[in-house]
């Protein structure tokens, strides 16, 4: 914490007030921030900060003040409410597995002020302590680079961006009535569901739902429906009987069923009162419920198989007297009759319309009606209600009615939305087509059952009576009694002729076909074909003879029919000739059949006989899949040159595939490159390169053209043309960029082209799983380790990584690529690659990497590489976190480790040492203690080389001067780089702020309709992310400059440590001089014998202070007054002290005071010897340290220039990339507004 007297400095404000109050607060030492900031600074890795969107905090209000006259903005709470601040900071230092990399895990956390939240599946739920229960989506996650002085240098904070504040928010400008309408809509929905359920109520469900009712009637119903019930044995005997008797038996049983229900509420029946109240309750619960209908259907359900068997038996019974005996039981529509009329066509049923588009519409209705009418044969239709509904639906389809209309006018004529009037005569013809082609067996029995066993009385329902009368009319029209009439015979003849004609086309019998056409020509001459002619006949799918020739790939038949007589078929007949079930035109079918002769002939006919507008309409008409002729160009690529300019290349089918997209997906085409080239050249010519919106060619899975192209990307010119607005980093809905997809699916050619593009964000990670290209490469390699194409892809990716993100040096480079969690070791394993010719992958756990950095620093004590604690500051071991941070965190660790490897490459000396390999290969099996001992022994051995070295005061002063000068220079650099890092960190955030504010502006412009609101859905400027990695390139530069600052701090720390040793040396030197002075005093008073020794020792005493470092063999033998020395001199002083002790009787035979002087002198000699030992040890250490630190300072000067150069290069490259990405976004918006 800085001292309070320090002047307050202000940095630019952050747009997000919550982030600003924590990380950019000059009043951080005051309330309400003091305690929060202190706890965060003590251990920032124990907390995760939940950050609401900036525009929410700026624009909305505290919901607790909603009803107050004074409303408080959330912005104000950020700066004045401690509870608000601490409610957004959660403690994550709890035991929780941080293994998962998805948003599927859940955990409960406690905020700084003791409130509880639940994080589950990417959603934050407020819990105990919060006033409101909120459900907030996690928008994004990130690390926030701290730039303030009150947090640890280089610290990063885990951030969760959420969609609202933990207190909620409210906007006073939003009307309350709007909210109430939303509630009304929510309430209406269950009511609609209840009404829908009302129609599904059956008597059987009531019995299951209400046991009392079941107890009252179930036994009686069981006896009634039992096969031993003799009363109704007639329904179980297969004998000839009239249909009226079956009807009577059913009615009798129905009466018995009604009696069972009515008896259950009689007074003499047990529980009758409760049953009565229960029935009334049911009727109140379902108002309007017809209980009689439910009982009727319940009887049907139990008797249907018996009733239907009786009816079938009677209709199938061969009896020639049925006409007189039981005319209702006559079966008219037999299998033989269906066969005779199987090929009848609509144009032969006197339907008064000759417009081809009307005929197509009628055929569509017929086909749908056949599908509906065929349900009568479905075994699941077990009652009259289902059969009745099928008849209604069939007629409604034919008449294009969506509602049941009972007006008299509607019973005679019905006009669809397409202008076709369906009167009774047309309906008869349509029903004939439906009945004949549906081939429902026992249709007469179905109609009899509907009329006589129905639970609803339709006597007064004019519309349904009209429907039944039409079915009766059709059956009468096809009855056996009319077989001799010309009309019926004509139908049979037409059907036979149609069958003959269609068979000739299908079989390819062109000779007989020509004979048949000659006969037609002789009969009609050059006049037009009659409407009911077999040449105009169509199948039930609406296929004409031309369509049949195309489907049979019979180009000769097609040529004969269309060219035999130009009066037979008009251009409208050709343009509107479709298969009405698929809605495919002649050209579309010809393309799918790859009938090239027919395709050529068709296109020539259409281009020469239609206007430009008609051509555009025809070629862009779509089938039921939403596809036009352009979607099928891959069957005939030459058509692109011929009619490509007429195609709407942006037309999407049901899968959101445009014609261009479909071309790109034709992976099995033999000439895929030409197909791509033709397609793209065509759209460039048609639309112009600057007018193409490639976002219109994205399918419903989010795949762009870049995602979908298999190979030959260069042929498309998508990347080479600067005017093409295309996002090379766009994610599909599976969170794959084109780069990821090329790597995942081994698209080598495309990968080579994409890596050349400077808009490529190579290190892009999706915001859901945080996968990078290396994750997909690692996954593919694990599945196919021997794939040769994959090996080439590996080489491309690795080379790109080393060329663009590593120094251009000749030394071997090592990079961490990706990681996976090793469940056996309970740790993340990082995969490393070397830059040698044969890339090899090595996996190392985080624990081993921590050990590596520790051992490396221990071995290179004086290096400027940060120590282990500083390096792992933001990634401590065994620290828990929010689970969704796990993969994101390991990706940041990979980047951090790679920065370490880059620094090793730039080190002038360490680059030549294979440090990484020595540790992870040669010394892999050694324990940490063994490695520490090896390093200690080696360093001690290096120091022993200087064990006899003697340093003079002049030399020490030189070392001191050099170190202090270097320290001053480094401190000045550190101060400058620290200021620069603050500005870069602020700039990084402000660039994101700029993007957020700009997008917010667009959002407001869309909302206010200043810009077209329809574009809001397309561009989605709804602030889905707060701070995106693609917002700023300053983060890349900050990574290098922050590392440089940490390296400078480490180097200055090393210098200060040596300066402390120099101070110790000077202190020892001073102590020795003081000892010499005191020894001199004793020597002057010494006896003659000792004085001789002293005089000898002082002869050269004054010279030792100025000697250079010398070897011990050249040291002076006169020791007592020397202020420096070596170990030999120290030993001589110790020996002299012993000698003084031995000769004490000769020299000191005086009084006790003399004895004290002797002891004092001896003590001084021993003290001097000890000091000499210490200074000699310091001499060796200082010499060793001085050489190391001098070399490291020199290395650092070379390192920092090369290191920052790489950082600037990477920053500039990323800046250009991100600028182009943003330019693409804004240019696309501008072009869309113009359009």
UniProtKB/Swiss-Prot annotation:
GO BP terms: early endosome to late endosome transport
Annotated VPS9 domain residues: 323-487
Any one GO molecular-function label of the UniProt entry: SNARE binding
GO cellular component assignments: early endosome; late endosome; plasma membrane; transport vesicle; tubular endosome
PROSITE patterns named among the record's database cross-references: VPS9 (PS51205)
Region (Disordered), start-end ranges: 1097-1124
InterPro entries: Ankyrin_rpt (IPR002110), Ankyrin_rpt-contain_sf (IPR036770), UPF0507/Ank_repeat_27 (IPR051248), VPS9 (IPR003123), VPS9_dom_sf (IPR037191)
Recorded superkingdom: Eukaryota
Any Pfam family: VPS9
Biased composition (Low complexity): 1100-1115
Family membership noted in the UniProt record: Belongs to the UPF0507 family.
Protein name according to UniProt: UPF0507 protein DEHA2G04334g
Source organism: Debaryomyces hansenii (strain ATCC 36239 / CBS 767 / BCRC 21394 / JCM 1990 / NBRC 0083 / IGC 2968)
């Amino acid at each position: 914490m800085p001292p309070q007297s320090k002047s307050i400095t202000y940095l630019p404000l952050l747009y997000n007030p919550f982030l600003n109050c924590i990380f950019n607060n000059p009043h951080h030492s005051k309330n309400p921030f003091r305690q929060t900031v202190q706890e965060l600074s003590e251990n920032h890795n124990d907390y995760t900060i939940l950050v609401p969107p900036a525009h929410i905090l700026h624009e909305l209000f505290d919901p607790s003040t909603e009803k107050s006259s004074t409303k408080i903005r959330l912005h104000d709470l950020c700066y004045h409410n401690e509870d608000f601040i601490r409610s957004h900071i959660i403690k994550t230092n709890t035991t929780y597995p941080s293994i998962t990399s998805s948003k599927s895990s859940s955990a409960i956390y406690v905020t700084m002020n003791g409130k509880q939240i639940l994080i589950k599946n990417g959603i934050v739920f407020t819990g105990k302590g919060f006033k409101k229960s909120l459900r907030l989506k996690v928008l994004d996650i990130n690390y926030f680079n701290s730039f303030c002085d009150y947090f640890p240098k280089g610290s990063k904070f885990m951030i969760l961006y959420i969609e609202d504040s933990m207190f909620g928010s409210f906007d006073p400008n939003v009307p309350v009535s709007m909210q109430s309408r939303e509630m009304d809509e929510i309430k209406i929905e269950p009511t609609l569901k209840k009404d829908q359920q009302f129609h599904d109520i059956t008597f059987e469900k009531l019995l299951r739902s209400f046991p009392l009712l079941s107890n009252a009637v179930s036994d009686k119903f069981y006896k009634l429906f039992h096969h031993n019930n003799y009363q109704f044995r007639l329904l179980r005997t297969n004998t000839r009987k009239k249909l009226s008797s079956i009807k009577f038996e059913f009615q009798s049983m129905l009466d018995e069923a009604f009696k069972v229900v009515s008896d259950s509420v009689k007074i003499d029946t047990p529980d009758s009162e409760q049953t009565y109240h229960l029935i009334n309750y049911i009727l109140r619960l379902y108002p309007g419920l017809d209980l009689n209908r439910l009982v009727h259907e319940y009887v049907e359900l139990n008797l249907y198989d018996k009733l239907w068997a009786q009816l079938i038996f009677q209709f199938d019974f061969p009896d020639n007297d049925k006409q007189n005996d039981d005319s209702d039981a006559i079966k008219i529509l037999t299998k033989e009759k269906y066969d005779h009329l199987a090929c009848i066509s609509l144009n032969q049923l006197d339907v008064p319309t000759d417009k081809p588009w009307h005929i197509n519409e009628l055929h569509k209705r017929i086909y749908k009606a056949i599908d509906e009418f065929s349900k009568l044969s479905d075994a699941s239709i077990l009652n009259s209600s289902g059969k009745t509904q099928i008849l209604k639906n069939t007629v409604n389809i034919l008449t294009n009615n969506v509602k049941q209309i009972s007006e008299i006018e509607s019973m005679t004529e019905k006009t669809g939305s397409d202008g076709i009037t369906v009167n009774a005569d047309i309906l008869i013809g349509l029903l004939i087509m439906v009945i004949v082609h549906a081939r429902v067996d026992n249709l007469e029995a179905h109609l009899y059952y509907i009329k006589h066993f129905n639970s609803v009385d339709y006597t007064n329902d004019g519309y349904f009576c009209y429907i039944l009368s039409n079915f009766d009319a059709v059956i009468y029209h096809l009855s056996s009694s009319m077989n001799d009439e010309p009309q019926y015979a004509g139908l049979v003849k037409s059907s036979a002729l149609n069958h003959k004609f269609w068979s000739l086309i299908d079989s390819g019998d062109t000779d007989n076909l020509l004979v048949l056409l000659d006969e037609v020509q002789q009969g009609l001459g050059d006049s037009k074909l009659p409407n009911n002619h077999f040449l105009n006949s169509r199948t039930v799918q609406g296929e004409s003879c031309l369509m049949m020739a195309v489907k049979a790939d019979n180009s000769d038949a097609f040529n004969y029919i269309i060219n035999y007589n130009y009066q037979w078929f008009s251009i409208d007949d050709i343009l509107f000739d479709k298969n009405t079930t698929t809605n495919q035109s002649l050209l579309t079918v010809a393309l799918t059949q790859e009938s090239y002769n027919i395709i050529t002939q068709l296109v020539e006919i259409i281009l020469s006989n239609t206007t430009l507008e008609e051509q555009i309409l025809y070629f862009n008409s779509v089938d039921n899949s939403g596809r036009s002729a352009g979607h099928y160009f891959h069957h005939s690529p030459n058509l692109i040159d011929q009619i490509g300019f007429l195609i709407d290349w942006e037309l999407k089918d049901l899968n959101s595939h445009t014609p261009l997209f479909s071309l790109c997906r034709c992976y099995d085409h033999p000439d895929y490159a030409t197909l791509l080239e033709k397609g793209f050249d065509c759209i460039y010519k048609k639309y112009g390169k600057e007018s193409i919106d490639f976002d219109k060619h994205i399918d419903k899975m989010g795949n762009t053209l870049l995602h979908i192209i298999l190979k030959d990307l260069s042929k498309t010119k998508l990347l080479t043309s600067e005017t093409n607005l295309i996002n090379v980093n766009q994610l599909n809905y599976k969170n794959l960029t084109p780069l990821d997809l090329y790597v995942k699916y081994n698209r080598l050619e495309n990968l080579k082209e994409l890596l050349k593009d400077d808009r490529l964000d190579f290190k892009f990670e999706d915001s859901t799983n945080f996968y990078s290209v290396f994750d997909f490469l690692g996954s593919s390699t694990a599945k196919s380790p021997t794939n040769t194409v994959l090996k080439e892809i590996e080489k491309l990716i690795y080379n790109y990584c080393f060329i663009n993100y590593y120094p251009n040096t000749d030394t071997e480079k090592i990079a961490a690529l990706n990681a996976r969690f090793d469940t056996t070791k309970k740790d993340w394993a990082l995969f490393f690659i070397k830059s040698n010719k044969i890339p090899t992958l090595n996996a190392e756990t985080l624990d081993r990497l921590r050990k590596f950095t520790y051992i490396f620093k221990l071995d290179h004590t004086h290096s400027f590489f940060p120590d282990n604690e500083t390096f792992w500051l933001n990634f401590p071991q065994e620290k828990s976190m929010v689970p969704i941070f796990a993969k994101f965190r390991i990706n940041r660790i990979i980047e951090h480790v790679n920065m370490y490897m880059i620094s090793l490459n730039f080190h002038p000396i360490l680059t030549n040492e294979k440090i990484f390999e020595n540790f992870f290969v040669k010394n892999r099996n050694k324990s940490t203690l063994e490695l520490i001992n090896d390093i200690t022994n080696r360093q001690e051995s290096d120091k022993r080389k200087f064990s006899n070295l003697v340093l003079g005061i002049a030399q020490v002063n030189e070392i001191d001067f050099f170190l202090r000068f270097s320290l001053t220079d480094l401190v000045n650099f550190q101060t400058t780089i620290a200021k620069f890092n603050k500005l870069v960190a602020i700039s990084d955030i402000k660039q994101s702020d700029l993007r957020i504010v700009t997008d917010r502006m667009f959002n407001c412009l869309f909302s206010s309709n200043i810009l077209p609101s329809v574009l809001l859905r397309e561009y989605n400027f709804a602030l889905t992310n707060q701070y995106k990695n693609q917002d700023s390139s300053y983060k890349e530069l900050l990574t290098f400059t922050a590392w440089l600052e940490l390296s400078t701090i480490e180097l200055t720390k090393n210098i200060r440590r040596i300066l402390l040793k120099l101070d110790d040396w000077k202190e020892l030197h001073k102590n020795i001089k003081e000892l010499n002075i005191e020894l001199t005093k004793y020597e002057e008073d010494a006896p003659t014998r000792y004085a001789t020794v002293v005089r000898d020792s002082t002869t050269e005493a004054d010279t030792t202070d100025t000697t250079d470092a010398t070897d011990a063999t050249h040291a002076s033998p006169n020791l007592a007054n020397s202020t420096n020395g070596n170990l030999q001199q120290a030993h001589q002083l110790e020996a002299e002290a012993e000698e003084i002790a031995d000769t004490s009787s000769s020299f000191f035979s005086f009084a006790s005071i003399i004895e004290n002087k002797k002891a004092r002198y001896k003590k001084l000699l021993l003290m001097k010897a000890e000091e000499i030992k210490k200074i000699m040890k310091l001499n060796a250490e200082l010499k060793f340290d001085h050489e190391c630190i001098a070399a490291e300072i020199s290395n650092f000067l070379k390192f920092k220039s090369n290191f920052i150069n790489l950082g600037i290069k990477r920053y500039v490259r990323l800046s250009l990339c991100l600028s182009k990405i943003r330019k693409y976004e804004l240019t696309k918006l501008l072009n869309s507004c113009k359009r």
